């Protein structure tokens, strides 16, 4: 990923927070080049865990492979109508690229634990959270239909392209315009821009 110096994100805690909050990611493998959009969970141990449908043959290329997991935060079109001087439109965004070594999880109990963890995470905060009893035969049979994996981060790159190359007045105009948006992704960009002022 091309990252000019002024767009480089280096704070690991900030990058990890992005990866946890925007966990619906893109997993890319090679030979042939394949991408799958899926939830990936960054765990406290710094490893990323996920699963693919067994019918998705991408899992066959995971074991021992270098893979790329892309996490994308909010993004927004930036109109020159908010600039203080004449310029061109652009796009603001924040993204993290995790280059990883992949390992398949063969242990059924570990796979069950991963799936239970994922459901509990995404159900938390709901008024009536769905409860999973992974010991039930139904869920054990479902585990056979997926392949769980673990990704060890080898290299991590992150970029925040948030109009840092523009004058403060322009950045403020852009941020204020994005704050008015009904689109939560655009408001995320505004919030990230505000932290830079």
Residue ranges of model-derived segments:
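An N-terminal domain-cap segment
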Residues: 1-48
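Short, structured beta-strand-loop surface elements
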Residues: 55-114
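C-terminal edge-of-domain segments
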Residues: 103-197
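A generic structural signal for short beta-strands and their flanking turns/coil linkers
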Residues: 23, 36, 46-48, 63-67, ...
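Short, charged/polar surface micro-motifs in flexible loops or helix N-caps
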Residues: 32-34, 41-48, 54-57, 73-77, ...
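Catalytic micro-motifs at enzyme active sites that drive phosphoryl/nucleotidyl and oxygen chemistry
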Residues: 15, 28, 58, 84-87, ...
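An N-terminal domain-start capping segment
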Residues: 48-68, 179-184, 190-197
């Amino acid at each position: 990923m091309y990252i000019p110096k002024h767009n480089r994100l280096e704070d690991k805690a900030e990058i990890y927070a992005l990866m946890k909050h925007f966990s619906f990611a893109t997993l890319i493998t090679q030979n042939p080049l394949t991408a799958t959009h899926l939830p990936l969970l960054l765990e406290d141990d710094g490893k990323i865990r996920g699963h693919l449908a067994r019918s998705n043959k991408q899992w066959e290329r995971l074991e021992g492979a270098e893979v790329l997991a892309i996490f994308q935060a909010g993004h927004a079109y930036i109109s020159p109508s908010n600039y203080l001087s004449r310029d061109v439109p652009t796009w603001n965004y924040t993204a993290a690229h995790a280059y990883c070594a992949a390992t398949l999880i063969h242990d059924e109990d570990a796979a069950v634990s991963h799936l239970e963890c994922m459901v509990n995470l995404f159900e938390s905060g709901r008024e009536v959270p769905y409860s999973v009893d992974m010991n039930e035969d139904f869920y054990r049979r479902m585990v056979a239909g997926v392949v769980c994996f673990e990704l060890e981060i080898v290299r991590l790159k992150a970029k925040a392209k948030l109009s840092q190359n523009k004058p403060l007045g322009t950045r403020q105009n852009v941020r204020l315009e994005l704050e008015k948006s009904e689109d939560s992704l655009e408001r995320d960009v505004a919030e990230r821009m505000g932290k830079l002022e």
